[in-house]
Amino acid sequence: MRLAGTAVGVGLAAGLVLTTPAAPASARPSDPGVVNYAVMGKGSVGNIVGAPMRFEWTYTDPFQSYYVDNPVCNNWADIGLPEVYADPDLASFNGAVAQESPTDMTHFVKQAVGVYATNDAAGRAFHRVVDRTIGCSGQTTAMHLDNLTTQVWTFTGEPATATDATWVKQEAGTDRRCFTTTRLRENVLLQAKVCQAGNGGPAVNALAGAMQNTLGQ
């Protein structure tokens, strides 16, 4: 009986060893070339937001095409900004804008991805978003665009985590809102923004997840 008990015990122990999941592999830095894949095309974007996106354009350098009356909200007003991404250690960058047509922005989506030479450099970029926008949540400010139009937006957001920041801006007098997420993943800073009437939160999370899945980490 003692032998049988020993055998059962060994069998149980072996079973436990076989069914214990392996520890997850550590993430590794992304190669600069991932920016060519991390930005989703208009077809994929349309599937995510549930609307036909017939027009898109891409950009390969960070840019800013506006100024805001309240500077603390500058880095929440848009994504892909030089103030955020510009750094001597920025190895590669890519971004895209998609909308329903050249003149129809009922659904408007913007993406930005930057790969840095080091994780620390990417972390600095992330903090140029979160540190410089402290106090923006709850604020309303005018946004003056380069095309000489002015929009007024109210910003709301939760405190950022060590790797993620999300916020919403709503245009004054409308139900139009832009849902934005910023994610720090190893040596990559990625951002996604979905603007539409109603709740674009699920769509922006799905878009950022699709972008993140291409990073090869």
Model feature map: region roles:
Residues 109-112, 183-196:
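Short, well-ordered beta-strand elements
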Residues 193-217:
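Surface-exposed amphipathic alpha-helical segments
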Residues 94-101, 177-185:
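Short, surface-exposed beta-strand/loop micro-motifs that present aromatic residues
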Residues 54-56, 60-64, 131-176:
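Short Gly/Thr-rich strand-loop-strand
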Residues 1-27:
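Secretory targeting and sorting signals
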Residues 107-110, 174-180:
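Short, surface-exposed coil-to-beta transition loops
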Residues 26-98:
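N-terminal "mature-domain start" segment
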Residues 95-127:
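A short acidic-to-branched-hydrophobic micro-motif
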